[in-house]
Amino acid sequence: ASDVYKRQVLACIYRLIYLKNKNMRKKIVAGNWKMNTLPAEGVELAENIRANRNQVCSCVNFIVCPPFTHLGGVIEALRSSDIEVGAQNCAAEDKGAYTGEVSAAMLAALGCRYVILGHSERRQYYGETSATLNKKMAQAFANGLQPIYCVGENLEEREAGRHFDVVKTQIEEVIYNLTPAQFARTVIAYEPVWAIGTGKTATAEQAQEIHAYIRTILREKFGAAADETPILYGGSCKPSNAPELFAKEDVDGGLIGGAALKAADFLAIGKGFPQK
């Protein structure tokens, strides 16, 4: 009976620690529009999100990441609101003869606050490596942008049981190079690449398992600061599954793809956080 009592007390203590850590982290819903919408459509989408934002608790931080061509219009549409704007990528260099590139300084000058770096599509289609991403991270920080750094394994890596190793490498080769001050400004997003467009589904338990592992890796390098780092789920997050995902201890929000293109769905996802 004594052992049972001790276990119950410990369970209560762990639950209190979980609630404290979970509640002190930012709740973030970030929309990655990818290569979708035309500029006027993007502005209309931003205006719709803004018009209905008050339906969701002010404790939820909304970020929209439209294509480069939309940034000026979207930033203007969201001016004086609490909805932040981010870019989907930035150059690894600060300026010069890099045709087609957009620098972090340019993004910051427009009014961007965030930038997505290391997205699985950038890694897969454009061959982005840790070496490139280290340079992009440096550019982001040098210009006052907060990176949303993406990690995740593909189907082959998941089925081979290498998912922990892949994510660990992606963290160690880039995030471990940050100073404590830079780390404090970083958001992590986990993308289960194997569950995106494959017909396979990542469960909330699978999401929590890898999110907890990511936080453990971060804690090994940065200590207690890792408990304050938001870790977003970048799988197929929708209004229907957001509550189950966001209830998990180490899931602090979502990096949203398709559902971010409809204002109602995007905002509904923000309602998925547990109530205190």
Tell where the protein language model's regions lie, with residue ranges:
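Short, small-residue-biased leader/transition segments that mark boundaries at the very start
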Residues: 1-5
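Active-site loop-to-helix "anion-binding N-cap" substructures in soluble metabolic enzymes
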Residues: 13-276
